[in-house]
Each structure stands twice: as structure tokens, then as C-alpha cells.
Amino acid sequence: MLRTPYGDVYENHECVEAVKSAVGLLESLGHICVEDYPPLDVHYHEARILVQSVGTNAWIERVAKGSGLPISEDTLEPLVYKAYLEARNVTASAYVAAKSELTKVMRDLGQFMEHYDILISPTMGIMPLEAGFYNPFSRPEMPVHDWVLERRRWSGNTAMCNVTGQPSI
């Protein structure tokens, strides 16, 4: 995959060149490699963010109960606390709808993978970031949703593998 599943171009050519190099090696060993992309709509990230946020809340509440620590801005990182507060407002119907959407993504990717053994893609679409850049503390005003979507440009395929259970290296 020389671009993201939804058509975005990777920001760093070195990441794409690494994929091309891996494909060249596989072809030299006799494997047939084709360029193809799973039928994913970028909007599945909305459902992924919602489900992940609710799951994180459950984890936070279990840890708080077990540790005796309160759930507050004093015990959680700012972005995590902000995400916790936002996810408390998710309704059951919104959660079920998001899970249904992710199930469709899983089935669509499963059907796509019936034709292939592996996907070769950049794990990251950019070169390593400077220390501190990936730090949510640097932009506390940024909504959690926007921060998660910004990360998508860095790791365009990782979420797809996380949602569907596809192996990823």
C-alpha cells in the first residue's frame, strides 16, 4: 500500500520507499505482489474513537476503584481526563451503532483479505517525530477527537489493523 486506505498520500517518501523495497525483495523471492487497497471509508474513525473512548473510561474506573485514587485532573494526564469527561456522555445507542459500524469494517476487510496473504504498508506515514511533538500537553485546548484524527496522518494503517485484528508489523 503506497497510500493510506482512504487515498491520502504518506507525508514522507522514505516510508513509501521502504514499502517498495520490501515489495522488491518479496518479488525477487518469487512472490506475486499487487497494489490494492481495502474498501474503507475514512469515517470509520469516528466509530473507532467512540468505542475506544468508552473502553478507556471503563479501564480508568476499574483502576480508580482498585487503587482508591479519585478520577480527576490531578490523577490523570490532561488529555486522558478530557477524554474521560467527553466519553461519559456517550449514549448506549451511539455505542451500539459505533460497534455495528466497526463490525462492517471488519467484515469488509476480511472479505478483501480473502484475495491476499499479507498487506505491506508503512507503519508510520512520517519519519520519527522530535521528542515532545506527540505530546498532548503542548496543545491543551485541542479537542480529543481532533487530536486522535491528527494522529491518523502519522499512522494511517495502524487503526485499521487494531479494529480488525489484522496482523501488523
Regions found by a protein language model. Name each.
Residues M1-T4, S53-G110, M124-M127, A131-F133:
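Short helix-loop capping/hinge segments that flank enzyme active sites or metal/cofactor-binding pockets
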